[in-house]
Amino acid sequence: MVVLMAYVDALFDTADWFRQLWAESLGKEKSTDGRVVETGPTPIAARGATDQHSQLQLYVEGPRDKVVLMLTARQRETEVVIPDGELTRSRDEYRYLGDRGMGVLLDAELRGTIGSLTNRRRPVGTIELARVDAPSLGALLVLLECATAYAGPLYGVDPFDQPGVEEAKRLAYAALGRAGFEAKDLPPIVGEGRYVL
């Protein structure tokens, strides 16, 4: 499994796009020489720090079958500052937050997550953009596309076809009655011999 965890909200769509790219390019039944291999790492798009709190336990102590890649940017568009007010001054457990930007808080969360994975000897890496802008995003997309293209031969599959997706399209065309597509391989729809809950 490959987890791409975006620590900048503007980069989450890129993590989501990577999930689609990696899944359709590397999830294959057959190798390039025709052998049945049923291979491909499961891609997971995650949003740090939200998914850090919902998924990190699994990544730190669960099966050792994941590589976690952090996606962040050195320069953020806007910085929301936590005011140094009554709450941060009146309670010791909040005092350290006063006058700190949310970027500082997210960076600390990122460092903590990387540290917890590293301390448990879990594979983790970081991709840091200078900023979230067109040149940086373009470079990131090319990097992820190249990584996918190079991973195909490592798994012994062609990363440039998607026969599983094509089959689903053909079956959908058949279900819609499109000329030239037969419905003989269609499964029954819900209610036709299947349990409905």
Predicted segments with their positions:
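A SIS-like phosphosugar-recognition module
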Residues: M1-L197
